[in-house]
């Protein structure tokens, strides 16, 4: 069994980015919009991690806090100002989740695909599916970069992905297919997940449950 060290690969990528950014005429700017997130909630932790990672490589981060009472149309108009004035930022993230009265799909699709660094816009999702150059969801793309760093060729491999979200499972399935893997997407309604996994060369799980995959789910050499 090979241990894939994601932290080591991430560190290497950050060092490469740091050198690249250092030679640019100006620092890139990342804008993060937060709609009334709890000060100690998960969203704050995610954003703090993003800020830390960005600043380590030389990216300036602007965090904008908006009251939870904001109307959906007003939030979309606010985002539109960044779409129309591309000098304001190089990338835009709307931190999820949003309040119940706001349609996340509408808001995410109001971001210019060029600024959509999360890769959630429908245009970027379609381009990811088609195997074209675009902004890709970070977790899915990170998994591909991790495999690449260890020279793991997925061509012809049976890949089982236990996640069907738009953030991980679906884009990862597209990226794997574009690299000629044979992909099966499993989820909470799938029958006999153990049997499915036993035939896999590569298993990717994103179910958020520790020890979900047991030793006897994995075939020798996977």
List each model region and its residues.
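Glycine-rich phosphate/diphosphate-binding loop of Rossmann-like nucleotide-binding domains
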Residues: 41-51, 134-221
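Short beta-strand elements in bilobed, periplasmic/extracellular small-molecule ligand-binding domains
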Residues: 54-68, 183-185
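Short, Asp-centered acidic motifs that coordinate Mg2+ and/or phosphate
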Residues: 90-91, 202
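Anion-binding alpha/beta catalytic cores of soluble intermediary-metabolism enzymes, centered on
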Residues: 93-154, 172
């Amino acid at each position: 069994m090979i241990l894939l060290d994601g932290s080591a690969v991430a560190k290497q990528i950050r060092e490469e980015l740091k050198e690249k950014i250092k030679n640019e005429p100006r620092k890139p700017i990342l804008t993060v919009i937060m709609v009334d997130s709890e000060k100690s909630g998960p969203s704050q932790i995610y954003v703090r991690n993003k800020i830390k990672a960005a600043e380590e490589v030389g990216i300036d981060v602007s965090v904008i806090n908006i009251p939870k009472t904001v109307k959906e149309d007003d939030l979309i108009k606010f985002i539109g100002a960044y779409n129309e004035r591309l000098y304001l930022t190089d990338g835009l993230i709307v931190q999820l989740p949003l309040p119940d009265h706001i349609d996340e799909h509408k808001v995410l699709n109001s971001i210019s695909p060029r600024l959509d660094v999360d890769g959630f816009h429908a245009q970027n999702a379609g381009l990811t599916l088609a195997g074209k150059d675009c902004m890709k969801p970070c977790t899915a793309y990170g998994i591909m970069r991790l495999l690449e760093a260890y020279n793991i060729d997925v061509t012809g491999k049976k890949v089982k992905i236990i996640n069907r979200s738009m953030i991980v499972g679906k884009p990862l399935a597209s990226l794997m297919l574009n690299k000629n893997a044979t992909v099966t997407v499993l989820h909470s309604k799938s029958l006999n997940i153990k049997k499915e996994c036993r035939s896999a060369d590569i298993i990717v799980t994103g179910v958020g449950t520790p020890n979900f995959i047991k030793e006897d789910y994995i075939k020798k050499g996977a």
